[in-house]
């Protein structure tokens, strides 16, 4: 392993904002991870494990060690009824989805082009167009930072929720995802009830769904390689049936979907209807085609993004009485932070 000192983080996160890390190292094996996390030499140093850095914003320089997960490898087994994959945590997610489609393995096509690594998918319980990671998860393996051993959780033990999992709670800063196990029924059925997939026929092929999802994402979402961003910046808020009924009276065209504990309202619709598409502070801008995405127009600072996010949150609350929660992770000087904490520090 080679440790970089004073490393520029711009190439390591998709927002592409200039920030520095005191140390940065690329981990290519579980032994690398054990050496970094479990040895006395680096035990006291704050650490942040990242994959593609596709769902985070460094709010300032990071004083600890950034560990880049580059564990690679895909193992494929099958029986009469199922395909089973064991995927190393550093595998690129869009490439994994593409590989599955090429192999005729259905189940991930709705999750095409979501940036990031396989190891990040269970942490966020990534989802799109009616499918979430939990729907295809068999197990998740992780390095336990307390014991230095690799452990396995079943899908049920991962406690998946909307953009949520055990890795954000009981196992927060106690685990590094090393691999995921995925399970796909050979009797594949397309999930095409959402958005632009609705007009696909029920007998469509895996490739048809994949192509439609890719085309939609490329049309609506900016390529981080061209214009820095972290994808969907805010979560879709879940409100009670009563609150939704009141909202629907004033806004009959509100975009929403049933949720387990109420109604999930489209955050992009709320931001758009608040007149914020194209709204800009410094080099940070609400994307003109997809209001849920904040982009770096080229010279944005973290301060620009934070100020814009806070402004969006306040304006949406003023319009609808709904408080948006950011989906993007905010990384502070030595630990994870959030928008409320940042705003209180500015006061």
From Swiss-Prot:
Its main location: cytoplasm. Residues 17-187 form the FAD-binding PCMH-type domain. PROSITE patterns: FAD_PCMH. One of its GO terms (molecular function) is FAD binding. Its EC number is 1.3.1.98. Pathway: Cell wall biogenesis; peptidoglycan biosynthesis. GO terms for cellular component: cytosol. It is an enzyme of class 1 (oxidoreductase). Keywords: Cell cycle, Cell division, Cell shape, Cell wall biogenesis/degradation, Cytoplasm, FAD, Flavoprotein, NADP, Oxidoreductase, Peptidoglycan synthesis. Belongs to the MurB family. This is UDP-N-acetylenolpyruvoylglucosamine reductase. It comes from Vibrio cholerae serotype O1 (strain ATCC 39541 / Classical Ogawa 395 / O395). The gene is murB.
């Amino acid at each position: 392993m080679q440790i970089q000192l004073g490393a520029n983080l711009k190439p390591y996160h998709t927002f592409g904002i200039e920030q520095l890390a005191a140390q940065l190292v690329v981990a290519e094996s579980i032994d690398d991870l054990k050496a970094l996390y479990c040895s006395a030499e680096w035990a006291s140093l704050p650490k942040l494990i990242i994959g593609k850095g596709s769902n985070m914003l460094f709010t300032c320089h990071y004083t600890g060690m950034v560990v880049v997960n580059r564990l690679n490898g895909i193992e494929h087994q099958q029986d009469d009824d199922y395909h089973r994959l064991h995927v190393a945590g550093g595998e690129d997610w869009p490439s994994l989805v593409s590989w599955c489609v090429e192999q005729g393995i259905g189940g991930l096509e709705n999750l095409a082009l979501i940036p990031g690594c396989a190891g990040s998918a269970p942490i966020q319980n990534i989802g799109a167009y009616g499918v979430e990671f939990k729907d295809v998860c068999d197990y998740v393996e992780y390095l336990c930072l307390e014991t230095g051993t690799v452990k396995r959780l079943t899908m049920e033990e991962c406690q998946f929720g909307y953009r949520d999992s055990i890795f954000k709670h009981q196992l927060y800063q106690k685990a590094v995802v090393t691999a995921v196990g995925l399970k796909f029924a050979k009797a594949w059925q397309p999930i095409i009830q959402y958005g632009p997939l609705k007009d696909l026929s029920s007998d469509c092929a895996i490739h048809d769904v994949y192509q439609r999802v890719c085309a939609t994402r490329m049309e609506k979402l900016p390529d981080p390689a061209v214009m820095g961003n972290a994808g969907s910046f805010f979560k879709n808020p879940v409100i009670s049936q009563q609150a939704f009924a009141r909202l629907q009276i004033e806004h009959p065209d509100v975009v929403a979907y049933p949720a387990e504990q109420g109604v999930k309202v489209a955050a992009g619709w709320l931001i758009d209807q608040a007149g914020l598409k194209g709204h800009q502070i410094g080099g940070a801008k609400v994307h003109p085609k997809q209001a849920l995405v904040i982009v770096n127009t080229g010279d944005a600072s973290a301060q620009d993004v934070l100020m814009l996010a806070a402004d969006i949150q306040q304006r949406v609350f003023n319009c609808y009485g709904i408080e948006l929660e950011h989906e993007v992770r905010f990384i502070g000087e030595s630990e994870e932070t959030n928008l409320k904490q940042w705003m209180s520090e500015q006061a």
